[in-house]
Amino acid sequence: MSEVKYKRVILKLSGEALAGEKGFGINPPVIKTVAEELKDVYDMGVQIAIVVGGGNMWRGEAGAQMGMERAQADYIGMLATIMNALALQDNLESIGVPTRVQTSIEMRQIAEPYIRRKAMRHLEKRRIVIFAGGTGSPYFSTDTTAALRAAEINADAILMAKNGVDGVYSADPNKDASAVKFDTLTHLDIINKGLQVMDTTASSLSMDNDIPVVVFNLNEPGNIRKVVAGEHIGTTVRGK
C-alpha cells in the first residue's frame, strides 16, 4: 500500500457532481472521470465506500414544496440515488474496479441489501462499496447516511467531495469578497455557526463518533488522492 493517512474512507458524492455543467441527469464524461479518480485511489490500497446523492435528478424538499407528501417525495429521491449508484458501478467495473452496490431499500434483482458485516467484508476483499437509497427512511439526508455508514463500518474519515467548492468559508465567497476559508474547524463550529458543510444531524453523528470530515473540491484532478495521502487541502473538521 502507498503511504496513506486514511486507509478506509467514506466518499460523499453529491448527485450534482455527476451532472457536470448540464446541472441535471448524468453526464457520461464526468462520471467516467470520477471513476478514474477513484481507481487511482483504489490502486493505492485504500478501502473505499461511497454514499451518492440524487440531487441531479430529484430533491425531496423540492417535491414537498410542490405539494407532495414529504415522505413520498423523499422516497423518490432515494430511488434517484440508486440510479446514480448503478451508473457509477458500471463505470468503475468497466475500468477493472470490482464494485458492489448495497441499497437500504431492497431491490435484489439489481443490488444487494445493505448488510453491515457484508459491506465490511467487501472492503476487506478489495471491492468498492456504493451505499444507495439513503438511510432508507424519509427526512434523512444523504449527508446523514454518510455519517451513519462511516460510523457503522469504522471509517477513518468522511471525504465530502464538493462540486467546485474548495473548502468551508465564513460566507459564500461568490457573494462576499471578505469571506474567509477555514483550514480546520470542529464539529461544534459547524453546528454553532450554521456553516454549510452537512446538516446538523450528520454533523452531530460525526462529532459523537469522532469521525473527521474533509471538505474539498472534487473538480480539481487528483484531489481525492491528495486527501487520502494526508496532503492538506480543503477544510478538515474534527473534534468537538
Curated annotation (Swiss-Prot):
It comes from the Bacteria. It is an enzyme of class 2 (transferase). Pathway: Pyrimidine metabolism; CTP biosynthesis via de novo pathway; UDP from UMP (UMPK route): step 1/1. Pfam families: AA_kinase. HAMAP family: PyrH_B. PANTHER family: URIDYLATE KINASE (PTHR42833), URIDYLATE KINASE PUMPKIN, CHLOROPLASTIC (PTHR42833:SF4). This is Uridylate kinase.
